[in-house]
A protein has these predicted regions:
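AMP-forming adenylation/ATP pyrophosphatase catalytic core
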Residues: 156-353
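ATP-dependent adenylation/nucleotidyltransferase module used to activate substrates
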Residues: 1-199, 333, 342-343, 347, ...
């Protein structure tokens, strides 16, 4: 009697409905699945978790870890928010989507890392929950092929939910995965996925929705390109550093001048985060009253310093005072500015990034 060898696959799992179904589908074929969840630094829910919770006080769960536990599969959590990933963000070969999202390059980067894990684990292939035509940039037929080829996974990247609509992969051709038991889902509708989840007893999953990545957010995208523009203005290298990733998702951002930017904390947690990044920046705080902490980056003129102090004074208990004192601390330099809080909302909004 011929004994079927164990088939092992590496699955990219976000915890969303599609990747959960992809794992369940292959498990039903007897495939040993190891899940992988990549942390890029730009996941909104994970950033909120690390900052202590959402604005309403609730703390989001890690859906990938939850899904792996529910499906009883091993999961590896991989931090890819390193210099290589950040360099890709600034110089994407295939460009950006509507905002600062280099979706195709990001998927190539992830799949290349998944390939390394596949080889290390001795697995047969990599799979994802991607659905043909669901996303306008990264899930077109041509871009799915580009991602497979450029990541080095030619023939070994399976999309189980849309497999019947795509060319057979090596595991399908070799018979280690039964192509007839894979699916032919396409498009943006989730009705088939929801029906399958109900049929298979998968009841706990986040509601299908976009917007989990900061890079797809219009406001974040403005801040992303704004900081690159400031660095070019200052004659610096066009780059994004790890600390920028944190700061871009923290506080209110204002463009004081082409060479200087203000960040104002919105909560106690954000104030504490800004305190941690004060080195190399100017730190501002209103004296004698409760209020926000702020940082100024770049090379502010005297006028920009006063403007920063006035805007900061607007966000605190002293906003209705005739004048307040704002402390400017930059290295060994400590100055105090007596300013009137900025009251022109139109001007504030015009400066907001």
């Amino acid at each position: 009697m011929t004994v079927r060898r164990e088939v092992k696959a590496i699955g990219l799992v976000s915890g969303g409905l599609d990747s959960t179904l992809a794992v369940a589908l292959l498990k039903r074929q007897g495939v040993l699945v190891k899940a992988v969840n990549f942390y890029t630094g730009f996941c909104i829910t994970e950033t909120q978790r690390r900052k202590g919770g959402r604005p309403d006080g609730t703390v989001p769960r890690n859906e990938a870890l939850r899904a792996a536990a529910d499906l009883e599969v091993e999961i590896e959590y991989v931090d890819i928010s390193d210099a290589g990933y950040l360099d890709m963000l600034v110089h994407p070969r295939y460009g950006y989507g509507a905002n600062a999202n280099p979706c195709v390059d990001c998927r190539i980067f992830m799949m290349a890392r998944a390939k390394e894990i596949m080889e290390r684990e001795g697995a047969d292939f990599v799979f994802t929950g991607e659905v043909l035509g669901q996303r306008p940039k990264s899930q077109r037929r041509d871009t799915l092929r580009i991602i497979e080829r450029e990541s080095g996974l030619d023939g070994r990247l399976l999309r189980p939910l849309s497999a019947k609509l795509l060319p057979p992969t090596i595991p399908e051709r070799e018979g280690v995965v039964d192509r007839e038991r894979l699916l032919d889902i396409s498009g943006r509708s989730r009705l088939r996925q929801i029906a399958l989840a109900k049929e298979w007893g998968i009841l706990d999953y986040p509601q299908p929705a976009g917007g989990c990545c900061y890079l797809t957010d219009e406001s974040f995208g403005r801040k992303f390109f704004d900081i690159l523009g400031q660095r070019e203005e200052l004659g610096e290298e066009r780059r994004i550093a790890r600390e920028d990733v944190v700061l871009l998702s923290t506080g209110r951002h204002f463009r004081l001048s082409p060479r200087a930017k203000l960040i104002v904390g919105r909560t106690e947690v954000e104030n504490a985060i800004l305190e941690g990044f004060a080195e190399g920046r100017a730190r501002l705080e209103v004296r004698g009253v409760l209020g926000a902490v702020a940082l100024v980056e770049g090379e502010p003129t005297w006028e920009a310093r006063v403007l920063a102090a006035r805007i900061l004074a607007r966000y605190g208990k002293g906003k209705d005072a005739a004048r307040v004192e704002v402390e400017w601390r930059e290295g060994d330099l400590v100055e105090t500015y007596a300013v009137e809080p900025e009251r022109d909302e139109g001007r504030i909004e015009a400066l907001r990034i």
